[in-house]
Regions:
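A short, well-structured edge-of-sheet supersecondary motif
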Residues: 99-124
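N-terminal secretory signal peptides that target proteins for export/translocation
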Residues: 1-22, 53
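Residue-level preference for non-acidic, small/hydrophobic
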Residues: 118, 137-144, 208, 240, ...
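Small-residue-rich helix-loop
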Residues: 121-123, 185, 382, 392-544
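Short active-site loop at a secondary-structure junction
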Residues: 123-143, 147
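Bacterial N-terminal signal peptides
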Residues: 25-39
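Conserved serine DD-peptidase/penicillin-binding transpeptidase domain
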Residues: 48-100, 147-425, 534, 541-544
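Signal peptide processing junction and immediate N-terminal pro/mature segment
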Residues: 36-52
Length: 544
């Protein structure tokens, strides 16, 4: 057996941080079972704080070189920086950027350590629990990979009251039962339908009953974080989540015909489009305000998406995402549309009903979704909130059986898992596992410990591969694209109105991989990106 790594030494307490203002809207984009072998957990060497202050920090390439001599530039940078931050190992350009952004030192938290080292290169406010925003997805996805395994797949099943008759007709209801697949999109629903058609089903003479009992009811009883119910990032979890419960409208101007074409995905059986957009030749302007549709149910049971107003040819093609309808209505429309697309028929339009699959029902088809490794990649690359919440709830359902999945059961599962890893986190507060929360908390130090543990685990490569690559893809595709550090960072981002966070790994130019965690909780957090960029480039240059 390999020698166990050194155990943790907690960082020296620094200036106490205070959690500042209440958080408001998340502005992140939407997007997308082999259990691990047993054995002793690898406990990596957790780092101590630096013994003494870093005396200087190199200027980053993200800023144009000053004409003044380097010594004068460094002196000016240090003069603009908070000396307490610099004495804690935080590079002077980072501290100076915080000051320029109007972010007090107490509102920031940093922890940087080279993998395998026992001493941190930078540690500031590291024990203070902070709101991590979407970097909390690292806890959920690492737990998912370890507890469920990278090859875990969600199942969705179709049952019927009876086998299809000789003519392919099902006389009775059909039942669609979900187990929380985070990515049950049209392509996946089509596979389920194809299996049912291959089993001989051609016509359904009954209702469509949705069995969503795998998840508890009322998971979104507290509402959205900001009241923006039509924003895709606010979609709540459901055992039969279909296509993220979001309609994606594509607006395409055609100057040749002086029209604006509108298409939509996914196709819903009850959805109708009324396109009255007028193509103009002016400047694009605020196209979303002028071209956003109203989506309203009609007396005949259809749902009408109405477009009106002007749309400039200067805007080009755009996609507009709108979360709408209930989960049940959305999934009903998606199944009916896919059934008809595959050549299936209905003796009459099936009514939408909810309920459990009855005993004695006949299994028509079962579909296994994408493997967890692929799901984790979508969650972390694109910071998909509802997919993270689906995974978080699945942890409770799979590892703490005995009833519908709930956030409480999932929280207990994750806490027990952390304890088995030797990761005691007294300041950890879990809410929904996605970071789209005003309540969730974790310290930079604890996040760094988690990342060190992940790097030493068998699923470490899968987790790291799921992270956005600095300047290349995901939520980091536009960050430091021309800097020397581009392509060398693998980091999860976190964004709320008053939060900016980064957590992950940076490969230094001289060799070695570093764990990097930074969290800023302040009303001016959005102005502090320069501090994060300077930190990443400092680590890339060797963190010295």
């Amino acid at each position: 057996m390999a020698a166990m790594p050194k155990t943790l030494a907690a960082p020296t307490a620094t200036r106490p941080g205070t959690l500042l203002r209440r958080l408001s809207p998340l502005l992140s984009p939407l997007l997308a079972a082999v259990l691990l072998a047993g054995g002793p957990a690898l406990t990596p060497a957790y780092a101590k704080p630096p013994a003494k202050a870093v005396k200087s920090a190199k200027a980053t390439k993200a800023t144009k070189p000053a004409k003044a001599p380097k010594a004068a530039t460094k002196a000016a940078t240090k003069a603009a920086a908070d000396p307490a931050l610099v004495s804690a190992g935080v590079p002077a350009p980072v501290a100076a950027a915080l000051r320029r952004a109007g972010v007090p030192a107490a509102a920031a938290s940093f922890y940087v350590v080279r993998l395998g080292d026992s001493t941190a290169r930078a540690s500031w406010n590291a024990q203070q629990p902070m709101n991590p925003a979407s970097t909390m997805k690292l806890v959920t996805t690492f737990a998912g990979l370890q507890l469920l395994g990278p090859d875990y797949r969600w199942q969705t099943s179709l049952y019927a009251d009876a086998q299809p008759g000789f003519d392919g007709t099902i006389n009775g209801n059909v039942y669609l039962r979900g187990h929380g697949d985070p990515k049950l999109v049209p392509e996946e629903m089509a596979k389920l339908v194809a299996r049912a058609r291959a089993a001989g089903a051609t016509t359904i003479n009954g209702d469509l009953v949705l069995d969503r009992s795998y998840f508890a009811e009322g998971l979104d009883s507290n509402g959205t974080i900001d009241g923006e119910v039509q924003r895709a990032y606010n979609v709540g979890p459901d055992a039969l989540l279909y296509a993220f419960k979001t309609l994606s409208f594509t607006l395409t101007p055609d100057p040749a015909t002086q029209t604006v074409a509108v298409s939509v995905t996914p196709e819903l059986a009850q959805l109708k489009l009324d396109n009255r957009l007028t193509l103009t030749n002016g400047r694009c302007g605020d196209w979303q305000s002028s071209a956003s549709p109203t989506v309203l149910p009609q007396a005949d049971g259809t749902v009408l998406a109405s477009f009106s107003g002007d749309y400039s040819s200067d805007c080009g093609e755009h996609v507009l995402n709108i979360a709408t309808l209930s989960h049940a209505e959305f999934t009903w429309g998606g199944f009916v549309a896919e059934w008809q697309r595959a050549g299936g028929r209905f003796a009459r339009l099936p009514a939408l009903r909810s309920g459990k699959v009855p005993r004695g029902a006949v299994l028509l088809a079962r579909h296994y979704g994408l493997p967890l490794a692929d799901i984790v990649r979508d969650i972390n690359k694109f910071s998909n909130n509802v997919m993270a919440r689906q995974l978080f709830l699945t942890l409770g359902a799979e590892m703490d059986r005995g009833g519908p999945a709930s956030t409480g059961r999932s929280i207990r599962v994750v806490q027990r898992w952390l304890a088995r890893q030797g990761l005691d986190m007294p300041g950890l507060v879990l809410d929904n596992g996605s970071g789209l929360s005003r309540a969730e908390r974790i310290s930079a130090y604890d996040m760094a410990r988690l990342l060190q543990q992940a790097a030493a685990s068998p699923v470490g490569p899968v987790l790291i591969d799921s992270l956005p690559v600095l300047g290349v893809d995901g939520t980091l595709r536009n960050r430091l694209t021309r800097a020397s550090a581009a392509g060398s960072g693998y980091l999860k981002t976190g964004t709320l109105a008053d939060v900016r966070a980064l957590a992950g790994y940076v490969d230094a130019a001289e060799g070695g991989r570093y764990v990097v965690v930074s969290m800023i909780n302040h009303a001016n957090a959005a102005q502090a990106q320069e501090a994060h960029d300077a930190l990443l480039q400092w680590v890339y240059r060797g963190a010295h």
